[in-house]
């Protein structure tokens, strides 16, 4: 986990050498998948391709910064359980009690760390392709709505939860 000069957390999810087959053989380039977050509810992801690794990472990071979205957090976890989907990938995200930690793998873990979630249970279903898992996770996170937002939509007063 590395922080840049703006206090953003940058995580490399996937770095691949890809080949384009041309008449004279194969032409290689690099593909990078990066997640950027502020550790306080904002997160974005980007993909970059270039002839050199640093350039691919730079492009991916720029795209990630441009596409950042806000995620509602409640005490370092999610407000409620959510299922995100993209392609064959499904990602189940469950809120967890304090001290649980981030129980997630690969791309899901990178997003959770970047967005600032400390306690969560996650399961990727259907695929382990980092691109689809990442997009499914982002779909789940962007579908989350805060209690304040929902109460405003419904024109109701927000009450304390019943125990």
Curated annotation (Swiss-Prot):
InterPro entries: Ribosomal_Su5_D2-typ_SF, Ribosomal_uS5, Ribosomal_uS5_bac-type, Ribosomal_uS5_C, Ribosomal_uS5_N, Ribosomal_uS5_N_CS, Ribsml_uS5_D2-typ_fold_subgr
Pfam families found in the cross-reference section: Ribosomal_S5, Ribosomal_S5_C
Spans through the membrane: none
BP terms from Gene Ontology: translation
PROSITE patterns in the cross-refs: RIBOSOMAL_S5, S5_DSRBD
Any one GO molecular function term: rRNA binding
Disulfide-linked positions: none
This protein's GO CC annotations: small ribosomal subunit
Gene3D superfamilies the UniProt entry points to: 3.30.160.20, 3.30.230.10
Highest taxon in the source lineage: Bacteria
Record keywords, A-Z: Ribonucleoprotein, Ribosomal protein, RNA-binding, rRNA-binding
Domain S5 DRBM: 8-71
Quaternary organization: Part of the 30S ribosomal subunit. Contacts proteins S4 and S8.
UniProt family annotation: Belongs to the universal ribosomal protein uS5 family.
Entry remark concerning the domains of this protein: The N-terminal domain interacts with the head of the 30S subunit; the C-terminal domain interacts with the body and contacts protein S4. The interaction surface between S4 and S5 is involved in control of translational fidelity.
Function: With S4 and S12 plays an important role in translational accuracy. Located at the back of the 30S subunit body where it stabilizes the conformation of the head with respect to the body.
This protein's name: Small ribosomal subunit protein uS5
